[in-house]
Design a protein with these regions (language model features):
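Short catalytic/signature loops enriched in Gly
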Residues: 141-145, 235-324
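P-loop NTP-binding/switch modules centered on Walker-like glycine-rich loops
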Residues: 40, 176-180, 184-265
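A short, proline-enriched helix->beta-strand linker immediately N-terminal to the Walker B motif
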Residues: 169-173
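ABC ATPase NBD Q-loop/coupling interface
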Residues: 13, 67-85, 123, 194, ...
Length: 324
């Protein structure tokens, strides 16, 4: 197994109290596999990714339990200099806001090339040639002419391709893409997702795709983990999720996607708001918003029930959800 996250717990200590951002998250990604992690803002999906990468803000963040096994090594037991050697070379991350992630006063070629000068000891000339090669690989037109340009001279979609090029530079075994299509036009979103999928297949990387949009993962992911209030509430192969969700939250996410084949249908919206992570409701955190909630949901935290050999749902009424 390439990556295994086991019972991970992360909290943030603030003046107002302790926010439990990640509560017992477990998932895995193998070589050549794509896992989509879905959930609303504040669900813990990005915090989990930051913990995997070792870029969590500590303090106020703190990993309070669990294991993160990468190629059999527990990353949480490594020193910072050992983590740094893995970061970039073995695993890399694509952030959601390319403009703020790129240095505005350095050319894109210099920023891509820096990975080779720092990690591979290349000369600047050779690093620039590698930068051009990578820009070609991520389908940036006229890469040789544009390698000296600055981030503001590229469109949003092209900047995101530069971020992908930087993530691919050292040919890592795992890439984490955190909302890589945020703020992009729908057509550009599709192009970026297609590019990621093509590169993942070509290089046999593991890919974790973090998103709140079920619509962008249908043709890319192999399996899905749905998160809510710091917990995983459903995991399944992507086709099973789309065919029939086994958790009311997943069902709500699917029904809230606009569809062209259902003209005149009122667009569904999940009632209420995600909980305050400093005051998570007792029992199932989704119970105040759930149409199926019963007394047991308000008192007992549901485990991940086995729906099938490849599927789990943290809902006492997963059978009713499937049949609904």
């Amino acid at each position: 197994m390439l990556l295994e996250v086991r019972d991970l717990h992360v909290e943030f200590r603030t003046r107002d109290g302790v926010a439990k951002a990640v509560n017992g998250v477990s998932y895995s990604v193998d070589e050549g596999e794509t896992l989509a992690v879905l959930g609303e803002s504040g669900s813990g999906k990005s915090v989990t990714a930051q913990a995997i990468m070792g870029i969590l803000d500590i303090p106020p963040g703190k990993i309070t339990g669990g294991e993160i096994l990468f190629q059999g090594t527990d990353l949480l037991g490594l020193k910072e200099d050992e983590r740094r050697k893995i970061r970039g070379a073995k695993m890399a991350m694509i952030f959601q806001d390319a403009l703020s992630s790129l240095n505005p006063v350095l050319s894109v070629g210099a920023q891509i090339g820096e990975l080779f000068t720092v990690h591979r000891g290349m000369s600047r000339k050779d690093a620039k040639a590698k930068a051009v090669e990578l820009m070609d690989r991520v389908r940036i037109p006229a890469a040789k002419e544009r390698v000296g340009q600055y981030p503001h001279q590229f469109s949003g979609g092209m900047r995101q391709r530069i971020m992908i090029a930087m993530a691919l530079a050292l040919e890592p075994d795992l890439i984490i893409a955190d909302e890589p299509t945020t703020a992009l036009d729908v057509t550009v979103q599709a192009q970026v997702m297609e590019l990621l999928a093509d590169l993942q297949r070509e290089l046999r990387m593991g890919l974790i795709l973090i998103t709140h949009d079920l619509g962008v993962v249908a043709d890319v992911a192999d399996k899905i983990a749905v998160m809510y209030a710091g917990r995983i509430v459903e995991t399944a192969p992507v086709r099973e999720i789309y065919k029939a969700p086994a958790h009311p939250y997943t069902k709500g996410l699917l029904e809230s996607i606009p569809r062209l084949d259902q003209k005149g249908r009122e667009l569904y919206a999940i009632k209420g708001l995600p909980p305050n992570l400093m005051h998570i409701p007792p029992g199932c955190a989704f119970n105040p918003r759930c149409p199926l909630a019963q007394d047991v949901c308000r008192t007992d935290v549901p485990p991940l029930f086995e729906v099938s050999p490849t599927r789990r749902s943290a809902c006492y009424f997963w059978k009713e959800t499937l049949d609904a």
